[in-house]
């Protein structure tokens, strides 16, 4: 029966409609369990990377820490590099969210990009130097997952939008490609961060000079 009334022992009783709710609940529970397992694997992998680095990280150890079979790791992440790519995108999203609350003028590239660098350095402190450098190193590695382009990352989107705003304000040439300029800026920044000494005044000064040089090169004369 799908509705209406039933006659039970001479009494008219509304029948209970048959619905798909139980099946939906089962699917919802399974999806929640899948996401919880994935999160455990992700957290265990990041912790292992912090101890051993990407190259030295043991997938079996990651799986054991997460309490899953080795194959479960590969079910959620095809390679160890995929974990770092996801971590990078999550960190970039945090940085962009923080930058969206900025007080600097939208076309003030120097202030915006300097602030961006400060947030990236804060991310380095959160993640630790080993994970941070491995994450940045993927941008220059042949093992970077196919299809993960820097220009499609949240941070790149923010930088490109900032350059485009400066173009609209007449501070950067409209003939320049904002997308290309954004990728050039971030590629250079990541290279400096991946190869330079960590947590030093000299590096902070170098990064400030880098931002100034890039912005001056973009600006209209």
Could you describe each region identified by the protein language model?
Residues 71:
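Key DNA-contact positions within bacterial/archaeal DNA-binding proteins
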Residues 121-160, 194:
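Short secondary-structure transition hinges
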Residues 86, 97-127, 178, 182-185:
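Hydrophobic alpha-helical connector segments
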Residues 35-43, 55-56, 67, 76-100, ...:
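An amphipathic alpha-helix adjacent to DNA-recognition modules
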Residues 1-52, 56-65, 82:
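Basic, helix-initiating cap at the start of DNA-binding domains
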Residues 130-136, 149, 168-212:
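Hydrophobic/aromatic-rich alpha-helical bundle segments in the mid-to-C-terminal region
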Residues 42, 114, 118, 156, ...:
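An amphipathic alpha-helix signature
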Residues 104, 152-181, 196, 218-221:
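Hydrophobic alpha-helical bundle segments that form small-molecule/ligand-binding pockets
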């Amino acid at each position: 029966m799908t509705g209406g009334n039933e006659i039970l022992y001479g009494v008219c009783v509304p029948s209970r409609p048959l619905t798909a709710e139980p099946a939906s609940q089962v699917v919802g529970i399974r999806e929640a369990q899948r996401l919880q397992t994935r999160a455990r694997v992700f957290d265990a992998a990041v912790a292992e990377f912090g101890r051993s680095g990407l190259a030295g990280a043991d997938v079996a150890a990651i799986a054991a820490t997460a309490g899953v079979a080795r194959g479960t790791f590969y079910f959620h992440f095809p390679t160890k590099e995929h974990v770092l790519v996801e971590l990078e995108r999550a960190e970039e999203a945090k940085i962009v969210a923080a930058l969206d609350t900025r007080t600097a003028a939208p076309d003030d590239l120097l202030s915006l990009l300097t602030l961006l660098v400060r947030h990236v350095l804060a991310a380095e402190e959160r993640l630790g130097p080993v994970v941070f450098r491995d994450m940045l190193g993927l941008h220059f590695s042949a093992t970077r997952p196919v299809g993960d382009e820097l220009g499609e990352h949240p941070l790149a989107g923010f930088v490109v939008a900032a350059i485009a705003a400066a173009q609209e304000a007449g501070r950067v040439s409209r003939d320049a490609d904002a997308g290309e300029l954004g990728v050039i800026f971030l590629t250079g920044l990541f290279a400096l961060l991946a190869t330079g000494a960590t947590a030093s005044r000299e590096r902070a000064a170098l990064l400030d000079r880098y931002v100034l040089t890039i912005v001056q090169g973009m600006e209209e004369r």
